[in-house]
Amino acid sequence: MVRIALPNKGRVYEPIMSLFEGAGLHVIEHSQRSLFAKTVDENITMLFARSRDIPGYVENGAADLGITGEDFIQEAGADVEVLLDLGMGKAELVLAVPEASAIERPEQLAGKKVATEFPEITKKYFATRGISVHVVEVCGATEITPHIGVADAIVDLTSTGTSLSMNRLKIIGRVLRTSQRLIASKASLAQDGRKISEITLALQSVIEARGKRYLMMNVPEGALEAVKKKLPGLAGPTVLKVEADSPMCAVHAVVPENEIYRVINDLKEVGARDILIVPIERIVR
């Protein structure tokens, strides 16, 4: 039995559940208030917890796999194996001070107070730079602390910078880039490595297919080389012979979604026709 720990709430909850659905690991009999859930695979169950707690659960074997942010993994100092970057929940841990502050560089914070929800990461950031600061641990509303005299600076997460700007803060240092990671217990890898590899491959195949489309078209043999030059495929297009009155080929290729509009026009210009664009659910490399 493989137990997977997932975030029980937050902006990544729905994308993560959709990822598992796309991978064929459908969750059954679950609501957001449930702590556990079964899946269509009787050998896989899910448990739901705070993202911050998941690295510890995986490290101590309460869960075999988990999904959580790189920031929480680093903060916990968890001895786990990172298997996959899911590419979702992207954010950055930054060092910021009030816009009116004369401080422009991290070195100018020597001897001052820095508020954060990530004290271990913050201590390491300053220690590696030889800067002595007093770290003040808080549990939310970090942005307010410089304005009420609790701290001179903050280390906080931002994805767009909007919240920092609204709270009249400016970035003077970048601490850590984070996104959601699939992590594994080292003991579980040794014991259930095959099953864990199956789960990892299933999730990775969905991630690989994101932002890609499958193109199929008919191409006169005389236009084949020109068409091939226009296709930014994964490893070159697949070319198949077509039974037709005139020499014809079927060309298949995987193309980035954001290039479709340009590629179709280019293909038509050099002779491609009967072009089909098909969504891709999974790509297994």
UniProtKB/Swiss-Prot annotation:
Keyword hit for Transferase: yes
GO CC terms of this entry: cytoplasm
Keywords: Amino-acid biosynthesis, ATP-binding, Cytoplasm, Glycosyltransferase, Histidine biosynthesis, Magnesium, Metal-binding, Nucleotide-binding, Transferase
Class of enzymatic activity (EC top level): transferase
GO biological process: L-histidine biosynthetic process
Protein family per UniProt: Belongs to the ATP phosphoribosyltransferase family. Long subfamily.
Role noted for this protein: Catalyzes the condensation of ATP and 5-phosphoribose 1-diphosphate to form N'-(5'-phosphoribosyl)-ATP (PR-ATP). Has a crucial role in the pathway because the rate of histidine biosynthesis seems to be controlled primarily by regulation of HisG enzymatic activity.
Protein name: ATP phosphoribosyltransferase
